[in-house]
Amino acid sequence: MEEALIQWQERELTQTGHYYKHICWMVVPLLWMSCYFYGPRPLLLCGVAWLVGNLCDRLISLLRRRVYQPKDYSNESFALIIALLMPATVDWYVLVAAVLAGVLIGKEVFGGYGSYPFHPAAVGFVVAAVSWPEQVFRYPQPYASIPLWDASGVAVSSTISDTLRSGGTLNISTLSLGLGEYAAPMGTGAALVLVACGLFLWVQKDIRLSATLSFLITSAVIVFLFPRQVGLDNGPLLMNLAFRLRCVRDELLTGAMLFSAVFLLNEPYTCAHHRLGRILYGVLMGVVTVGFRYFGVYETGVCFALLVVNSISGWMDRTETHLYALLHSRKNAGDTAGKEGAE
C-alpha cells in the first residue's frame, strides 16, 4: 500500500509540481515589497520558514524510508505562504510552530503530497492564529524600524480590523491600499503586485478564473448589498453608491482577501476540479469568508473559511460528476429511443 501511494505521488508530482514551484517564485516580488516597507526582517523570516519546510520534507522522507524529491516544492511553498500571512514583527517560535503545524498536521498526517483534504498553509496559519492571536493579528506600520532578532519593542496595532469591525471607513487612499502602505500582514497588502502575480499564475494555468473570480465577485456583491459601515444599510442603494463601492474596496483589499484568491484558493488538491464545482467553491468561499469577517473575531477570516469549504470540495466534485453522468445517460437513452422509433 505504501509503495502504491509513493508511485501515485510521484506521478502527481510530474503533473502538478510546477504549481508549487511557481508559487515560490511569485513570493519574490511580494517579499521585495515587504523588505521595502519593513527592512530585512521579512527576508529572514521567509528564509527560516523555507528552511523549516525543507527540513520537514527531508525528515519525513527519512522516516518513511522513501527517496527525497528535490523537485517537490510543496512544503516550501506552504511555509512561504504562512510567513507572508504573518506580521513582520512575529516571533520566531510562532512562525516555526505555524510551519510545523501546516506541514506535519496539515499535510503529512494525511499521507503527504496530494493526499490532504485541507490547505496545509491555512492549517498552519489557523493553529498560530488561535494559539497566539496577539502575535498574528497585530501589525507594525510601514517604514517602521524593526530589529532583525527581537521585534517585541516595535509598536503594533490592529487599526484596520478595529475600524471596519466598529462600522467605520478607512482613511487610506486607493493608491496606498494598492501599494500596501498600511499596517497588514507582510505579504498581503500590495494589491497591484498580487494582481500581477495572479496574471502570471493564470497564464501558466496554475490558477483558474472560475474559482478566483466567483470568490471575489460573491464577496463584493455581499459587501455592496450588506455593508457593515454604520448607516449605509438603511439608506437608498443608489444614493450611497459611492460609499458602498468604497466599502467593497476596503473589504477586498484588506484582510488577505486578494492574497488568498491568488495564493490559496486554487491549490490543486483542495480546490474543486470541475468548472461548475469551482464556481460553487468560489461562491461558498465568498459567503463564508464575509461571514467570518463580519461576525468572527479574527481579521484574516479567509483562512478559517478555506478550511470550512475544503471539507466539502470533494463532495462538490463527486456531485457534479454524478449529475453529469446522469444527464448524459438520459440524453444517450433518448437518442437511442429516437433512432429506434425512426427505424
Model-inferred region functions:
Residues 70-75, 80-151:
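Membrane-interface helix-loop-helix junctions at boundaries between adjacent transmembrane segments
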Residues 117-121, 249-257, 278, 296-309:
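Loop-to-transmembrane alpha-helix initiation sites
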Residues 26-33, 53, 57, 75-84, ...:
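Hydrophobic, membrane-inserted alpha-helices
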Residues 7, 55-67, 103-114, 196-205, ...:
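C-terminal ends of transmembrane helices
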Residues 39-51, 89-98, 177-191, 243-257:
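Structural signature of hydrophobic alpha-helical transmembrane segments
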Residues 1-21, 292-343:
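Cytosolic-side transmembrane-helix boundaries in multi-pass membrane proteins
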Residues 1-61, 338-343:
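N-terminal signal-anchor module of multipass membrane proteins
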Residues 115-195:
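Long hydrophobic alpha-helical segments that form multi-pass transmembrane helix bundles
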